[in-house]
Every structure is written in structure tokens, then in C-alpha cells.
Amino acid sequence: MQFFVRPGEEMKWWQAWKETRMAWHRALGFGDDRYRFHDHEKLAHYANAATDIEYNFPFGFKEVEGIHSRTDFDLGNHQKFSGRKIQYFDPETGESYVPYVVETSIGVDRMFLQVMSAAYTEEQLEGGDSRVVLRLPAALAPVKVAVLPLVKKDGMPEVAQKIVDLLKYDYNVVYDEKDSVGKRYRRQDAVCLLYTSDAADDMQCVD
């Protein structure tokens, strides 16, 4: 993302974007203490400020997003090599200028690695077995509700489907009637399900 600013105000906006982007990362729910800023001591020739937001992976702190004040390098070079005037008339100051750029850059691959490394858990069970559980924060869970009829008879699948119909416009809902209910709960644990509904418990609540 490139944010265009008035020359001379780029440091104010760079600081504002640092705070905004750090707040976004912390809102994911993995713990505020797992993030830090790493300001660059050596800057690229076009930059006058740069920092990375780093996340504490199992293998140490690594960058997940960069925030840079790129001065007028980008638009200035477009203007220079295109031969066309690229300036903004500022109605507040009555001046025309080449805007400075504050840029934030985040990669989907690193974010995916961050989410999976934080959420992936292997629980040890009795007998030496283990099971995979994905402990995603609620905001990131892809499925919010699973509806699981206890048996495939006595009208339970129909009741379960009514529950799905009531919820599907407000939540990401899955319906599962395959295998035992315990195995179905287990499958939902593996993808970080937030809520389940047993149709047997809800038959008295649904007409």
C-alpha cells in the first residue's frame, strides 16, 4: 500500500502507519508480546525511515511487514522518465508538489506461516496417541458453527438442516452427519470450530 503525503509530513505519517499496522497485527489475537518493531539502521538510498514488524516464530523473530518512508523517489522518477508532470495541487497550501510516499508491504505467505505456526497444536492423548488441533483466534476461524445430528433417523437430520438454514446467512456453517458424533467433533477441532449444535438438544427448540 502506498500512501501519498505532503513533503515535510512524511515522518508524522510514517509513525502513524507504524502504530496502525502494529495494532492490526495485535488484533489477530496471538499475543501482543509476540510482536516488535525493528527499525533499519541502514536505509535504502531513496528512504528516510524504515521499520519492520517482526513476529516471534518458533525459530525466532522474523519480518512479517515492512513500513517505509520512500520520500518522492517513486513519483519523482515517474515524472523524470515519463517526461510528464506528476504533481498534486494542494488546495490547503495553494502549492503544487510531487507527493512523498509512505509504503506498507505485507506478504500473504508469511502471514499464513505466522497463523499456522501460532495455531497448530498437537495434543498428547492417553496411550501415546496424539491429535491435531488448530487453535485459531475467533476472528480467523474459517468455520464458526457445525451442526451435527446425533443419528441419521427419527427426524434429526431434518431438524439439523433447519438449524443450518437459520444460521447460514449470519455465519459460516457446516453440516456433518458422517461417522460417529465423536469423530465429527474431532474433525471440527482440527479446523478450529467455534460452536457446535447437537440436533438432539435442539429438537424441542425448532418447529
Question: Which residue ranges define each predicted feature?
Answer:
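NTP/phosphate- and nucleic-acid-binding module
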Residues: 2-198, 207
